[in-house]
Design a protein with these regions (language model features):
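Conserved class I S-adenosyl-L-methionine
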Residues: 63-73
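S-adenosylmethionine
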Residues: 87-155
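Conserved SAM-binding loop of SAM-dependent methyltransferases across substrates and taxa
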Residues: 74-87
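Conserved alpha-helix/loop element of class I SAM-dependent methyltransferases that forms part
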Residues: 28, 32, 45-63
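N-terminal auxiliary segments of SAM/dcSAM-dependent transferases
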Residues: 1-38, 42
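Short amphipathic alpha-helical/adjacent loop interface patches that line ligand
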Residues: 23, 49-52, 100
């Protein structure tokens, strides 16, 4: 957790507790359902959580903003971003049901109230969002083709 605090020192106590809980939760779930490379679980905070939060160094999402995390897998980048931005609404989507289950269980375990989940392919998402985030899902050109219809037209 120290690496998160190094880059985001102004976290509330609740956010600190939520980030701290992630390691044990993901280690437990990863032993049942492979959502993070077993060789990489020791680097959870540096390779997954901090990487997910990188966007927060260049943009501050306004309260009420809606963001879709496309191809969330076990909840990256959506869950770390939902912790960091508790007043922003996140919708996490993945085509693999067991990964959506892990993300849902992790979010529930740490008390996140600003996330919803959907087991679906990206092309099936009908709602629109202010932003779409994604991490290691597909080539960017392919991703752009899929998400064009999900971005609010005033963005």
């Amino acid at each position: 957790v120290e690496i998160i605090l190094k880059y985001f020192p102004d976290l509330t106590e609740e956010q600190r507790k939520q980030f701290a809980a992630l390691y044990d939760l993901y280690t437990d779930w990863n032993s049942k359902i492979n959502v993070i490379s077993r060789k990489d679980i020791e680097n959870l905070y540096e390779h997954h959580v901090l990487h997910s939060l990188g966007i927060a160094k260049v943009i501050q999402f306004r309260p009420g903003t809606s963001i879709m995390d496309l191809g969330t897998g076990g909840g990256f980048p959506g869950i770390p971003l939902a912790i960091l931005f508790p007043e922003v609404k996140f919708h996490l989507v993945d085509s693999i049901g067991k990964k959506v289950r892990v993300a849902t269980e992790v979010a529930n375990a740490i008390g996140l109230k600003n996330v919803t989940f959907r087991h679906a392919r990206a092309e099936e998402e009908k709602r629109t969002f202010d932003f779409v985030v994604s991490r290691a899902v597909m080539p960017l050109a392919d991703l752009i083709k899929i998400i064009k219809k999900t971005i609010c037209s005033d963005r």
